[in-house]
């Protein structure tokens, strides 16, 4: 079998393990998943190609499904954009794009466990097409990221949205479809601005009414964006990468971000609300990491 085929099989095995293993709060399986599947041997475009061919993603059926080809072409475009950016940002690199697509897939692997029950459970039930739109958003969310920080709210996220629209226009995707996809994509990608997290999470802490589909999708992308950074080993490494990225512009902040105190503050400032993340015990892992850091 080709390298790609054996990689697809590896991904299939991981999704199966994530569905069956009882790994209550033990980060080992997720650490292994990211370490094993996010290697330099596999390009970002190949990773997306492989994901589109897994049993998991093939199971999200859409009639005349345009998304697998669209996601693969888009990943190639994003990959090319990163290749010509020299040097590539230490954290917001293709490795981060891979992490987010892998994390979103891990969340997607839990759909069969999401309750059909009450109104609040139903808000979490997305259509197959919604999941494909989320994968497209995961590829888009940091497109063209120069490794700087937002000077104004949503600055870099808006740039990613613009580049995504340019890609769709270049690829002669039908205009009415571009309009619909961009209407979904824009609020979801903008929600990944770290400063928006408090606003977004407030909607999920307030149990007065179920959340809109757009908010549920935004939350799942944000959780995918944060997932790898929450793991004890991978998270430490990613903190070091972020420090390298920030060093030229703000060395003080760079020192904080890779310190134990900085990591504790980061972990205390986030949380995981979706039942998909809870099924994977990411919230338990976050709380345990905080305890361990404070015990040091």
Where are these regions (language model features)?
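N-terminal charged/capping segments associated with class I S-adenosyl-L-methionine
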Residues: 45, 62-64, 89-95
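Divalent metal-dependent phosphate-bond-processing catalytic cores, especially two-metal-ion Mg2+/Mn2+ enzymes
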Residues: 1-57, 106-129, 140, 144-152, ...
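Active-site alpha-helix of zinc metalloproteases
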Residues: 133-138
């Amino acid at each position: 079998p080709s390298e790609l085929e054996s990689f697809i099989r590896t991904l299939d095995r991981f999704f199966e393990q994530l569905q069956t293993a009882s790994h209550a709060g033990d980060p080992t399986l997720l650490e292994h998943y990211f370490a094993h599947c996010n290697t330099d041997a596999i390009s970002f475009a190949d990773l997306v190609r492989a994901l589109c061919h897994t049993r998991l993603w093939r199971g999200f059926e859409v009639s005349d499904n345009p998304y697998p080809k669209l996601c693969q072409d888009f990943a190639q475009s994003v990959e090319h954009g990163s290749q010509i950016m020299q040097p590539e940002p230490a954290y917001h690199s293709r490795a981060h794009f891979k992490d987010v697509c892998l994390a979103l897939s891990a969340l997607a692997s839990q759909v069969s466990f999401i309750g059909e029950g009450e109104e609040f459970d139903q808000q979490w039930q997305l259509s197959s097409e919604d999941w494909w739109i989320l994968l497209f958003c995961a590829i888009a969310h940091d497109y063209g990221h120069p490794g700087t920080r937002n000077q104004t709210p949503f600055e870099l996220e808006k740039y990613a949205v613009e580049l995504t629209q340019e890609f769709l226009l270049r690829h002669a995707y039908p205009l009415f479809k571009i309009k619909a996809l961009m209407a979904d994509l824009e609020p979801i990608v903008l929600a990944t601005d770290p400063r928006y997290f408090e606003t977004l999470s407030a909607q999920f802490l307030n149990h007065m009414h179920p959340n809109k589909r757009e908010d549920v999708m935004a939350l799942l992308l944000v959780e995918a964006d944060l997932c790898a950074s929450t793991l004890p080993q991978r998270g430490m490494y990613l903190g070091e990468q972020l420090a390298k990225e920030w060093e030229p512009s703000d060395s003080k902040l760079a020192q904080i971000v890779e310190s134990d105190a900085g990591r504790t503050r980061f972990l205390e400032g986030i949380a995981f609300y979706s039942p998909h993340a809870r099924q994977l015990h990411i919230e338990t892992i976050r709380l345990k990491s905080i305890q361990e850091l404070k015990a040091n």
